Design a protein with these regions (language model features):
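Active-site-adjacent segment of FAD-dependent monooxygenases/related oxidoreductases
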Residues: 1-51, 55-56, 60-62, 66-82, ...
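Surface-exposed beta-strand-to-loop junctions
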Residues: 21-27, 212-222, 285
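Short, solvent-exposed loop/helix junctions and linker helices
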Residues: 35-39, 235, 300-303
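Conserved mid-domain beta->alpha element of the FAD-binding
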Residues: 45, 149, 259, 265-316
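Conserved FAD-binding catalytic core of PHBH/FMO-like flavoproteins
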Residues: 47, 51, 57, 120-133, ...
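Eukaryotic short linear interaction motifs
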Residues: 67-69, 75-76, 93-94, 156-157, ...
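Hydrophobic residues embedded in beta-strands of well-ordered beta-sheets
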Residues: 83, 210-212, 281-282
């Protein structure tokens, strides 16, 4: 991605391209931004782990922790293994994310709602199901010097430690569509920030295989008492998200030939009450800090806690 197109309403409220600017400051780096599929990025990490560990370290999937204990009597002993974690291996069926019943033309579309903050935390249900499923009766007991919890905003590790995320949500819900678009919008294959007069905003990111990702502002939420504003996700479907995008991008037309994936989430800004327990168990990423996605620094900051911790942990 070399440029960003900025679209705003003119003095008559009609959507126009107001400017086109470099995606990054010219000359700041010999690198430029690119869009890569998450699977490709994970493959780079997996290959590097295998290479530099000489095949001794691998990433296991379909594994869920069921208990975490810290022996506080030995946390000051540098040679001790004070952390005990029980791991249970899930069956293939249990490990498969639950999808909503939404379908397009009779085909169920993969969605990311199972990890969205609009969905309830189902970790306890997964643990219970794993304990009852005979196919998933393999249990590991792991003794560790250190532990890094990078398990997202619903972090099981954070809850086991008794830490909380402090802050609040905004009143906005954002939907995400990965589509092969049908549109007369001229900059659909460019990175765009589109702001309408009254209907919200859309961010456009071109992807591989003719796909385009749209981040679409949906609506506000209701606040009940002193609680954070929360959303009822039952009404959120791909059609609702698409209709919001169509209103924002009018008078340009938008539909799609293929819907590849979708999700929705409520944006907020929170930070954990603590980042570590006894300097033995550490939290990283969304497990300990969540941000409004509209800030570019979010994408750079989220991995930094892990990057900073990893070199230190491998040396002890």
């Amino acid at each position: 991605m070399l440029e960003i197109s900025l679209w705003n309403p003119d003095e008559k409220g009609v959507l126009r391209r107001s400017s086109r600017i470099p995606d990054t400051i010219p000359g700041i780096s010999r690198f430029q931004q690119v869009v890569l599929h998450q699977g490709r990025i994970e493959r780079f990490f997996l290959d590097a782990i295998n290479e530099f560990s000489e095949g001794k370290v691998s990433v296991e999937r379909g594994v869920i922790p069921t208990s975490l204990e810290i022996n506080e009597k030995t946390v000051e002993d540098a040679d001790a293994y004070p952390i005990t974690v029980n791991l249970r291996h899930l069956s293939e069926e249990e490990a498969r994310p639950k999808q909503t019943a939404t379908s397009v033309n009779g085909t169920v579309i993969q969605d990311g709602l199972f990890r969205s903050n609009l969905s309830p935390d189902d970790t306890a249900e997964m643990i219970k199901a794993a304990e009852l499923n005979q196919k998933a009766d393999t249990v590991e007991v792991v003794k560790a010097k250190y532990m890094l919890g990078a398990d997202g905003a619903h972090s099981w590790v954070r809850k086991e430690l008794g830490f909380k995320l402090e802050g609040e949500s905004t009143d906005y819900i954002w939907g995400v569509l990965d589509i092969v678009p049908i549109t007369d919008f001229p900059d659909i294959r460019m990175r765009c920030a589109i702001h309408s007069a009254n209907s919200g905003s859309v961010m456009v990111i071109p992807r591989e295989n003719k796909l385009v990702r749209l981040y679409i502002q949906l609506t506000t939420t209701e606040k009940i008492g002193d609680q954070d504003s929360r959303a009822d996700r039952s009404w959120i479907t791909p059609d609702v998200i698409l209709e919001s995008a169509q209103r924002i991008m009018a008078p340009y037309k938008l539909s799609y030939r293929k819907l590849d994936w979708w999700t929705a989430y409520q944006i907020g800004q929170r930070v954990g009450s603590s980042f570590s327990a006894h300097e033995r168990v550490f939290l990283a990423g969304d497990a300990v800090h969540t941000h409004r996605f509209v800030s570019r620094s979010v994408f750079a900051f989220r991995p930094l806690t892990s990057y900073c911790a990893a070199p230190k942990l491998v040396r002890v």
